[in-house]
Amino acid sequence: MKQSKLFAAALTLMVLVALIIVACAAPPAPTAATQEAAPAAADMRPYRFVVVSHGQAADPFWSVVKNGVDAAARDMRVTVEYQAPQTFDMVAMKQLIDAAVASRPDGLVVSIPDPDALGDSIRAAVAAGIPVISMNSGSDVAKELGVLNHVGQTEYEAGYGGGERMAAAGAKKAICVNQEVGNVALDLRCQGFTDAMAAAGASVSVLAVELADPVDAQQRITAALQGDPEVDSILTLGPTGAAPAIAALEAMGKMGEIKLATFDLSPEVLAAIRDGKMLFAIDQQQYLQGYVPIVLLTLYKENLNTLANPVIMTGPGFVTQENAAQVIDLAAAGTR
């Protein structure tokens, strides 16, 4: 079943790459008369898209999304406006979406962290005839809201992929460190990880921590390891969870002995992977979450192209010791 899903994802990406090549293709060479009448600005497509996300472009994660949006706007030769509330504020985000719909753009890209708060605004966009692509969050509700496609990572599948890799590395008993038990997305990450490990004959327990207190998180991880010497592996659900795990293992002298992996990237995580202290990071490739929706909207407006898969998966991608140095350079360039 998992192989078929991976095949479907690979096929979707192959089709998407082909469509991008077509969309990026230069227009036919103009005649001399046309060159004189058509300045460079005329090469711009007449489309204006609006992106509304719950994350600010100044945030390290979302700045990479914004870079993807900007690159796609250049490549597709379209106008794109990127908007976000100043903080994580669903009331403000709803207002931004409503204002975007009122401005009648040619397409809308939204993240959907809270479908209860944003659903009516997204439905209003669809009802107004505005094509909508969702990205990053909302894969489970995008279709029912009328969204054409969702571009992002399905959390269960990402966790499952992490579990497969951890089990392949020889892990038999793991801890999934969850900083927000009850957060559906994070719970799904642990569940996918648990199911993949179980399929390989390994077991997982969930450890709740509070990342507002990194020292306490480190102590909880240390206590869990001391309380069960059979634990041989740890998965954290983000870089802020990886940091106290690294600190705990280093303090116990078990770095490298107990396998460690995490979701998402940070300079500390990338350095640890490069140096062989961590096995891998599960990368949702947020640059693609910014880039691909602009391509999809352009192709939809220009040629009514759609992709059959409701969710275009940008992850899980994996950063390992083999590619960490390259990813470090790409992260410095703002594309990873």
Which sequence ranges carry the predicted segments?
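Hinge/cleft segment of the Venus flytrap/periplasmic-binding protein
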Residues: 32, 36-45, 181, 196-200, ...
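Hydrophobic alpha-helical
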Residues: 110-127, 193, 205, 211-271
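Hydrophobic alpha-helical segments within soluble ligand-binding/sensing domains
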Residues: 43, 150-174, 216-218, 265-269, ...
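Extracytoplasmic "Venus flytrap"
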Residues: 41, 46-76, 81-97, 103, ...
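Flexible loop/hinge segments that line or gate small-molecule binding clefts
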Residues: 115-157, 171, 264-274, 278-279, ...
